Amino acid sequence: ADRGLSGSFNANVLKEAQNEIDTFGKENIDLFCIGKKTRDYFTRRDYNIIESHLEFWNDLDFQHAIKIGENIINHFISKNVDEIHVCYNEFVNVATQTIQSERLLPLEYKQDDNPSNADRLYEPSKEKLTKSLIPRHLNVQMWKYLLESYASEQAARMVAMENATDNAEDMIKNLTLEFNKARQASITKEMLEIVGGAEALK
């Protein structure tokens, strides 16, 4: 995220990213940072940041996902890294966002993805299909990550603001009660002083 006021939204995903990084070792990591908070966090810790993408959330569209996705794919194809992992906030509902860490590249295939050994005919060729479909798939995945994160951020901010409002209302009630007690005590004291003065004059 670029802004605060969203509770533990940023802290949670940064913690997960840090845990993920620790398993590989700082010296083996290249980072693509999305959002100011992420960039600032890893800049302060002197990580190798390849790219930072900032201040596009108000104009979020699929082109941003394509741009980020293409750069990440090129970094992988150039054999600068062996794997690409993504840490993001998954939107479940307004009250719940979960931290996810997924391996984006290389693609993972489940055993049951190929249930039979039957020959298949690919038109165009398998290689052409792969070259065409994989970038599209990765761009859609990147778009999904951005949308999930954006929805999670707005939900976290809404919950944080609602909690802040509730806390402020509770504080107002408590302060009003304290004020009324102090006011009543002051009035009682003044009345006692008046009565005491009147008794002294008798």
Regions found by a protein language model. Name each.
Residues A1-K202:
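C-terminal beta-strand-loop-alpha-helix "lid" module of Rossmann-like NAD(P)-dependent dehydrogenases
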